[in-house]
Amino acid sequence: DISIANELIYERAKFYKENYPNTDVIIGDIKEKIIFNKIIDKSKKNKIDFIITTPPCQGMSTAGKKDKKDPRNTLINEAINVIKKIKPKYVFLENVPQQLNTFVRHNDNEILIPTYLKSCLKKYYNFSSDEIVNSANYSVPQNRTRSIILLTRKDLKHIWNPPKKHKKIITLKNAIGNLPILDPLVYDIPFEKHLEIFPKYEKRLNKAISISKWHNPPKHVLRQVKVMIKTPTGKSA
């Protein structure tokens, strides 16, 4: 169970709380002393022995500008400070693969994040190898790569390393193929025109929502829908 979580934005915290109602979600900027101290105090009170840290990746993601001066890159400092204050048994550090090649400024020097982590925490922790992990190799129906660094406190005998890859690949069809079919919501045309193209839209939507509120139609422009309709199963456009 996740005992304590921190989120900057209220709407995201509310969504997280809906999924994990028993978690104490602390809302606010971890860079602010009052928020940081609240996290530390509650963590110590709850005797936290495992920390998951995933600092925002926009400053290093290939989908973003990869701005070296992006202040979000420096949130790794707060993660390190929390770890040093709590000293949990295990730490799970996750981010985009570019984390392994991203520099942060420390003592007026540019230093790679993995090197920085080790310089700050090697006194207390053993590190797993800096691995790029693909979720598809662990029964997740998504081809998604991430940098995963696992830390084990030095007083523990068991060293935490990534598990062996699963032999079977799970496809999206394997995972959700049993759910009711949905038609897309085409938002760049009048709704009447949309219903002419997808006359079963509302009937299928009602059936899907009766099973899960999360099973609702994706929103697309008509051009995208036409391309996807003509894209064979198992292929990408």
Where is each model-derived feature located?
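SAM cofactor-binding core of SAM-dependent methyltransferases
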Residues: 1-32
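Class I S-adenosyl-L-methionine
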Residues: 40-45, 57-237
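Anionic group-transfer/hydrolysis microenvironments
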Residues: 9, 31, 56, 96-97
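Conserved Rossmann-fold cofactor-binding substructure of NAD(P)-dependent oxidoreductases
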Residues: 31-43
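N-terminal Rossmann-like NAD(P) cofactor-binding module of classical short-chain dehydrogenase/reductase
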Residues: 50-52, 92
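Extended hydrophobic secondary-structure segments that form protein cores and membrane-embedded regions
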Residues: 4-5, 51, 132
